[in-house]
Design a protein with these regions (language model features):
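C-terminal and inter-domain tail/linker signature
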Residues: 1-137
Length: 137
């Protein structure tokens, strides 16, 4: 896996792809500040992450690097409907090297609430909808 960088010229992350997305454990879990509760299973996690990524107008990784013996930390910024959003993601792997647990912490609050509502709208009709904010009335 190629990673490590600060986003600067010497450690550019412009071509970084989070390869852990292609290596999810069957019972992987995801939780975070834009969600209520925890979603479990590769299909659930993949569906949620695809929904989130389709809402990003841009995404710039500032840092990607190992944490402990089985973790990976990503720090990135993006835009959702013109609003800036930043995120720290901690990915913990199982002994087989598969992503086992994902925690995402978004900021600022106004942007994370917007993201949560938009993800909820995208996931309407799925069992994962309940984890995200309700749309505006």
């Amino acid at each position: 896996m190629t990673y490590l960088g600060s986003g600067g010229p010497a450690g550019s992350l412009t071509d970084y792809y989070p390869s852990w997305l292609d290596n999810l454990a069957d019972n992987v879990t995801i939780e975070g500040s834009a969600m209520d509760g925890v979603a479990q299973g590769a299909e659930a996690v993949r569906t949620i992450l695809v929904a989130i990524r389709t809402l990003y107008e841009s995404q710039k990784f500032n840092f990607v690097g190992p944490v402990g013996g089985n973790g990976l930390l990503e720090d990135y910024t993006a835009q959702v409907r013109g609003e800036p959003i930043s995120c720290f993601v901690l990915i913990t792997s199982n002994p087989a090297g598969q992503a086992q647990h994902i925690v995402a912490n978004y900021r600022p609050r106004s942007s994370l609430l917007l993201l949560s509502r938009l993800v909820g709208e995208k996931l309407t009709g799925t069992p994962y909808r309940e984890h995200f904010a309700a749309g505006e009335s």
